C-alpha cells in the first residue's frame, strides 16, 4: 500500500471469498521450502511502527459460527525436527516499556466462557521419550530496584448453590523409583525477616469448619514416612 506523507498510509487487504451455501474460500500464505542445505523461508507479519502514536496491532482470529457448530480453531505450532535437531520453540512475549513511568505489556491467557461449562486452561511440559520430561516453570518478574512480583494461585468464589473450586498440589506416582517430592518453603533474608508460611482452613457458618490433615506415607518394605 502507498505511503501517506501528510495523512494515513494506504490500506492493504487480502480477503478470501464468502459463500452462501458452501464453505468460505480459504486463504493460504506459505514460505518456501528448502530441499538442500539451506533453511526454509521465513514468514513475518509485522504491524506498522509509529513515531508519535501507538504502533499498529496484529490480530489473528478464527471464524465465528451461528449454526450450532464449533467456532474455528486457532493453532500456533512450531516445526518438528526428524534429523537430530531440536523442535522449534514457541515464544509469546509482550512488549517492554522503556520510558520512565511506563509498564511492560501484559500477557493474558483466558479460556472461553460457556453457557454450561467454562473452557479449560492446560499447560503441559513435553514428554521425554528417552529422558526426563519437560519442566513447567511459573516465575514472577524480578524487580531490579524494588520488590519482585507475586505469584497468586487461587480458585474463585462459588455461586449461591455451588462449592468453590479445589486446589490440588500433588507429585507424581512411580512404579519402580521414588515418587516426586513436594516442597513448600519461604525465602531467606539477608538484612530482614525471613518469609512466613501460613496454612489456614476456612470457617464454617452452618457446618463443621475445615480440617487440616497431614499424613505420612506408608511403606510395604521399610519404615513409613515421618
Role assignments for model-derived ranges:
Residues 1-226:
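Surface-exposed, glycine- and small/polar-enriched segments that build interaction surfaces at terminal
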